[in-house]
Amino acid sequence: MKYIPHDYQRHTTQFIIDHPESAIFLGMGMGKTISTLTAVNDLVRNRFETQKVLVIAPIRVARDTWPAELNKWDHLAGLTVSPIIGTAKQRQAAANRRADIYTIGRENIPWLVKHHGNRWPYDMVIIDELSSFKNPQAKRFKALKKVRPKIDRIVGLTGTPAPNSLLDIWAPFRLIDNGQRLGKWA
C-alpha cells in the first residue's frame, strides 16, 4: 500500500530523525507506528545512522501490530523484523536472527538485557506505550536503565500521557533523556 502521510505525520517522522531522544504523544489511530517506521527506514537505509532497532511493546502489539505495519506499506519493503516472542529458546533464536527491527514484549526486557549482557546490540530503541514505564522500581525499568548508555537513539510513543502524579512523568523521561532534564533520582 502506498503511504501518503498527513502533515503532522511528516513532522513526526522528521522530528524522530532530527532528535535522537524523542517522545511522541499522538492519539490512537493518528499514525505513531507508521511515522516511526518511516523514520526507522530513513535512518537504516538512507542515512546509515542506525543498525539494529528494538521495539518494546505490549506482547500482542510486538507480535502482531509492528510486523503487520511493516509488511503493509510499500516504502518499507525490504526492512526485516524478528519478533522476540515465545519460550526462552524461541526468544533466543529470534534475538540471534539477522533483522533490521526486533520486537519484544515489555515483560521480557530483563531477559533480553541478561541474554545480551555487555554486548547490547540495539543502537535504537522504541518504547511503544511509554507510559507503561512509569514505575522506577519495576524490573523492566531497571533493566532498560542499565543498558540506556549503550542506546544512541530512543523514541517513546504514547497516546495517553496521563500521569497520576509528577513522579509518573519522571521514570519515562529518565529513560528518554538519561536523566538530563528531571535528574537521575533512581
Where are these regions (language model features)?
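Helical "lid/switch" subdomain of P-loop NTPase nucleotide-binding domains
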Residues: Q137-V147, P161, S165-I169, Q180
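Interdomain motor-coupling "hinge/lid" segment immediately C-terminal to the ATP-binding subdomain
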Residues: G159-T160, R174-A186
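PAPS/PAP-binding and catalytic site of the sulfotransferase fold
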Residues: L37, E69, S165-I176
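SF2 helicase/translocase NTPase motor core
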Residues: M1-K150, K184-A186
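Conserved helicase ATPase motor motifs in RecA-like P-loop NTPase domains
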Residues: G27-G29, I151-L166, R174
